[in-house]
C-alpha cells in the first residue's frame, strides 16, 4: 500500500470570527476544531501529518503537540502557497497526500478513508471531495463532462449562469499523488484579483497534463461545513452535539431531552445512566453505570462512580465514589475526593477535601482543605475554617465523629475518632479520641431585661 501523508491547513487568522482567539482554536464541544480534524486523521494509517500554522502558531502547536509536525506560513498568500510550505517535509516522497482544512471539525475518518480508497481505485493524480447542497452560493462548482469526468473547479464568482446552477461543490478536501502535487504547486500563479495562490488551480494544471482527476461525492454536506464566523461555529457545535448525544444513546445512556443536553466529545458515560435536561458534562468527565444526573447539574473533568445521583449541583475536577447522593445545590470544587455511600446535601461546598465512606454532610456546610474519616456526621452550618487571611491550613476529622450544628473548626486542627463536637462550638485546639469538644460561653438569662427595654419602644 502507498504511503499516506496529510496536510492540515491551519494558518488563517479568521477575521470574521472577531476574536482574540485564533480561528482553528475555537472549541467545538470541548475541543479546538483543528484538533478534531487531526484526531480523525490520526485514526487512519497515515505516516506523517503536517499542520501549516501561521497566526497563533505557538498555541496551535501546543494543542497538537505529539499529534503532528508543523510548518509555518509566514505570509498568508493562499491555500496553494500554504500547502507548498510542506515541501521540505513531503516533496519527493512516493505516496498520497490528504489536504484538509483545519476549520472543518465535522469531517470524519470514514469519509477520508473512502476518499483515499476511491483515489486509489481511479488511479488518479488528484481526487476532490465533493458534495451536493441545495444552495451552493459562494462555493466552487465541480464541472464534469457528459461522461461524468471532472473537467475543472470553477469558483462561484467566475461561474457562468449555467455553471452557477450546478449543485455539486468543492468541499476543500483533496487527495493527491504526493509528487504530482508538489510539482504542480510550483506552477500555480497568483494572477487573480486577490493576488493569492489557490489550491484548486492544481486541478487545472493536472488536467492540462492529461492526468486523471477524480471526484468522490459524499452524502452529507455537514461534514464539509467550514467555520468562518460565530454563526457557523454555533451550527458546527449543534451538529457535533447531535452526533455525540446520538452515540451515547446508542450505547445505552438515556438522554431525556437530547436537544437540551450538553456533552463534550471526550466525556464517557456508563450504561443505564439517565441524563436529565439542562445538564452540562465537560472535559474528560467519566460517569459510571446506573447514575442519575438531574437538571441543572454541571460536571467538568471529574470521575463519577456507579449509582450516583447528582441533583442540580456543580462538580469540578473531583472524584466521586459509588452510591453517593449529591445536592441539590452542592458545589464540589477541585480536588474533592468523595468516597462510597456519602451524602453531600443541599448548599454544601467542598474543596481539596477527602470525605470518607458513609459520611454525611447534609446541608449548609463548608469543608475546605479537610480530611474527614468514615461514618462522620457534620451538622448544619459547620465550617472548616481553613484560611487566616494569608495561609491555608488543614482540618482532620477522624472516624465516627459527630460535629454539632454551627461548629467552627479553626485549622490547623485535628478531631480524634469517635469524638463529639458540641453544637455552636468554635474549636481551636485538637480534640482527643472519644472526647467531647465544647467551646462556647455559658448561657446566662437576665430576668426581666427585655421587659425593661420595652422591646425598643
Swiss-Prot record:
Gene3D superfamilies: Hexapeptide repeat proteins, Spore Coat Polysaccharide Biosynthesis Protein SpsA, Chain A. Pfam families: Hexapep, NTP_transferase. Acetyl-CoA binds at residues 386-387, 423, 440. Residues 1-230 are annotated as: Pyrophosphorylase. UDP-N-acetyl-alpha-D-glucosamine binds at residues 9-12, 23, 73, 78-79, 140, 155, 170, 228, 333, 351, 366, 377. It is an enzyme of class 2 (transferase). Its EC number is 2.7.7.23, 2.3.1.157. PROSITE patterns: HEXAPEP_TRANSFERASES. It catalyses: alpha-D-glucosamine 1-phosphate + acetyl-CoA = N-acetyl-alpha-D-glucosamine 1-phosphate + CoA + H(+); N-acetyl-alpha-D-glucosamine 1-phosphate + UTP + H(+) = UDP-N-acetyl-alpha-D-glucosamine + diphosphate. Residues 231-251 are annotated as: Linker. Keywords: Acyltransferase, Cell shape, Cell wall biogenesis/degradation, Cytoplasm, Magnesium, Metal-binding, Multifunctional enzyme, Nucleotidyltransferase, Peptidoglycan synthesis, Repeat, Transferase. Its cofactor is Mg(2+). It is found in: Cytoplasm. The active site is at 363 (proton acceptor). It comes from the Bacteria. Residues 252-457 are annotated as: N-acetyltransferase. Coiled coil: none annotated. GO terms for molecular function: glucosamine-1-phosphate N-acetyltransferase activity; magnesium ion binding; UDP-N-acetylglucosamine diphosphorylase activity. PANTHER family: BIFUNCTIONAL PROTEIN GLMU, NUCLEOTIDYL TRANSFERASE. Homotrimer. This is Bifunctional protein GlmU.
